[in-house]
Amino acid sequence: MSTLTKFSAIPYTGPAPTNREPYIPVGVAIADARGDVIAKSLQYPAMIQETGQDMASFIVDKDNIVDVLRTLKESAELAFTMPLDLFAVDYPRREKRFDVIYQLYSLKNNERVRLKVRVGEDEAIPTGTGIYKGLNWYEREVFDMYGVVFDGHPNLRRILTHEAFQGHALRKDYDPAQRWLLTEKDVAKITPVIDPRF
């Protein structure tokens, strides 16, 4: 089956979505119950379910995140095939300073799941780009704004700030009065990146 809409240049040949209802956030009890089902499907001992959230939410060990992402995507029952977002939250007083948060969506089941990975300031987290290609620029943004390194990322470099920018602007200890304007000297130091993929 091929579908071409006025919004797409390339025909879509995949299966039609099985659930065409709009996403409606569920109650806490339903989210917790669904989280129990997902946790049983995954069976990772280092995964902790966070209850009382607006969607099924889990804290995952950084060493298991790639396996959890793969299982959520490849499971025929769960089918979390779309990464909606990846972002970080900075807790400077905590030993594991950053929460790196993944939000995934299942077109098949019309539901969302949230995964949190806690990492320290000098720790790296494995990249998820081998599972979801769409995580590429999300990971670059988290690296640029917070300094979280994604091991194995195919092109981990700044995406929102220039190469001469020092620091990471969304960290809570970043001085907002500090400005890193791009000067002619900085421009001379920057190596232009010509990426044939774009």
Specify the residue positions occupied by each region the protein language model found.
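Terminal low-complexity/charged segments
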Residues: M1-F198
